[in-house]
Design a protein with these regions (language model features):
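A short acidic/basic microdomain associated with nuclease active sites
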Residues: 20-37
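Active-site beta-strand-loop-beta-strand hairpin of nuclease catalytic cores
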Residues: 40-54
Length: 173
């Protein structure tokens, strides 16, 4: 096991995989860049029916403090994510550091631990439970950018193929 701190890229990939493993089957990490109205570039964001979840990766206290000055943090209604979390190694972000409404995830030995604010499965879609009213236009712009790239590469037509279901081999039905 490495004694080196987890990098920002590693945190973003872990966050994306964590979202996918927790019901957000459409998820992106920070290598995906898209235009959004207020310049927000998610470290990880996931979408499921009725909810979106943003995860911000923090590798240092200075990064945490700088993040607070961004326009979509000063005015949370400009930001993406019905639910918002910070992910870090223990000791970088603590519960008392969180802006109102945010939750906390820690990475320990390469695994994501739910520290604070992760809701039960049914709470994700209950409007009254959501801590934020996400900027749905920014989220739509983000998703449009992803779908447009798939279209430019000739893959968008595959959405009409339906869901792939496991079939026994040799069955042509």
């Amino acid at each position: 096991m490495s004694l080196l701190p987890v990098t920002h890229d590693e945190l973003c990939l872990l966050a994306c995989r964590f979202l996918q493993n927790n019901g957000f089957k459409v998820a992106f990490h920070d290598r995906f860049r898209a235009w959004t109205p207020y310049g927000e570039q998610a470290d990880a964001i996931g979408f499921r029916n009725g909810a979106s979840c943003l995860i911000e990766a923090k590798c240092s206290r200075s990064d945490l403090l700088a993040d607070r000055k961004k326009p979509f943090r000063v005015e949370p209604e400009k930001g993406m994510g019905d639910w918002r979390f910070m992910i870090s190694e223990p000791g970088i972000v603590n519960i008392e550091d969180l802006p109102p409404g945010w939750g906390l995830l820690h990475v320990v030995k390469g695994r994501v631990k739910k520290v604070y604010g992760w809701p039960g499965n049914v709470d994700w879609v209950v409007t009254a439970s959501k801590p934020f009213r996400a900027n749905k236009q920014a989220e739509c712009d983000y998703m449009f950018s992803a779908l447009r790239r798939m279209d430019l590469r000739g893959h968008l037509k595959e959405v009409y193929d339906g869901v792939i279901v496991n079939k026994p081999e040799g069955n042509t039905a």
